[in-house]
Amino acid sequence: MTNIRKTHPLMKIMNSSFIDLPAPSNISSWWNFGSLLGACLAIQIITGLFLAMHYTADTTTAFSSVTHICRDVNHGWIIRYLHANGASMFFLCLFIHVGRGMYYGSFTMSETWNIGIILLFTVMATAFMGYVLPWGQMSFWGATVITNLLSAIPYIGTMMVEWIWGGFSVDKATLTRFFAFHFILPFIITALVMVHLLFLHETGSNNPLGTSSDSDKIPFHPYYTIKDLLGLLFLLILLMILVLFSPDLLGDPDNYTPANPLNTPPHIKPEWYFLFAYAILRSIPNKLGGVLALVMSILILAIIPMLQTTKQRSMMFRPFSQILFWILTADLFILTWIGGQPVEYPFITIGQMASILYFFLILIIMPTASLMENKMLKW
């Protein structure tokens, strides 16, 4: 008798995606982060659902409803901190996942890569709107500052900002719609993930060598299911250490003060995962220029496939490109640090230099190094 997983219409799809999927035999632990992102999404949807049962999207009660969740709801504190720190884990995995794609040349699978960029933007939008919901000082002022950036768009900017706000300032209407969007977007993300996987399974996974894996494939289960479970275990250990020992480590103390439109916090800053983009935004004195640089800091990923000049897909055997990749990584760490610092000397100058280096590395230096490495192949 034929196995049910190979004949049942629904199980057949699951089988071809997660069980009998032919996978390259040599993919390293850097390939674990796709499944870890799936786990993060599941954690966020489940914890978010339970939080939504007790949260009220109203300016007068939002802050106290979050306090109520932490104090009065059974295990509410752990659900809330799992959700808040789960977002940090989500972005940590996202950045590593994108970095792996850049390092090993996965961006040559253009459909998968482009859906991935859309996913990155969607997750960033979801996280931003989620940060507004507790209605603390940083929630309110973060929402005010970031939504205000749209006013830099010529002619229609101000109209767009007021349209998003639902009035003339961030208020009840803004909070209500942000909650609605924050609730629906994870399900849109789930649909996009399915499209992402659909395109990935059309071409098959890349591997560290960047060569075709057709000659040597192994079934996904049990080899990579076990490997992914080990990665998941590490992720959960890290998440639980954060949640149980220092749940507020990555948060902002200002968000424990209820939102007050009459009192601006001394330093308005987003969560750590947005700091690199925030530093790029602040390093340009012109408002429109800053907004364009902010968008381009992420959108530049879409240009990377067009800038590829190398004859080798992976960076595994390209020492110059490897050095430049790790310089780019260090530059992103510097930008993240600068984003959390006040706007004063020497941080302004460091931020500007790091921002210039970021764009120069991706647009000019790395493609040039690839051309050089092509020449070296002939030596």
From Swiss-Prot:
Q: Name one GO cellular component term.
A: respiratory chain complex III
Q: Which residues bind heme b b562?
A: H83, H182
The residues that hold a ubiquinone are: H201
- Topology relative to the membrane, per the entry? Multi-pass membrane protein
According to the UniProt entry, its GO molecular function terms are:
metal ion binding; ubiquinol-cytochrome-c reductase activity
Q: Which InterPro entries match?
A: Cyt_b/b6_C, Cyt_b/b6_C_sf, Cyt_b/b6_N, Cytb/b6-like_sf, Cytochrome_b, Cytochrome_b_C_euk/bac, Cytochrome_b_N_euk/bac, Di-haem_cyt_TM
Query: What is one Gene Ontology biological process annotated in the Swiss-Prot or TrEMBL record?
Result: mitochondrial electron transport, ubiquinol to cytochrome c
Under the heading Gene3D superfamilies, the entry gives: Cytochrome Bc1 Complex, Chain C
**Which key words are in the record?**
Electron transport, Heme, Iron, Membrane, Metal-binding, Mitochondrion, Mitochondrion inner membrane, Respiratory chain, Transmembrane, Transmembrane helix, Transport, Ubiquinone
What's the further remark here?
Heme 1 (or BL or b562) is low-potential and absorbs at about 562 nm, and heme 2 (or BH or b566) is high-potential and absorbs at about 566 nm.
Protein name (database record): Cytochrome b
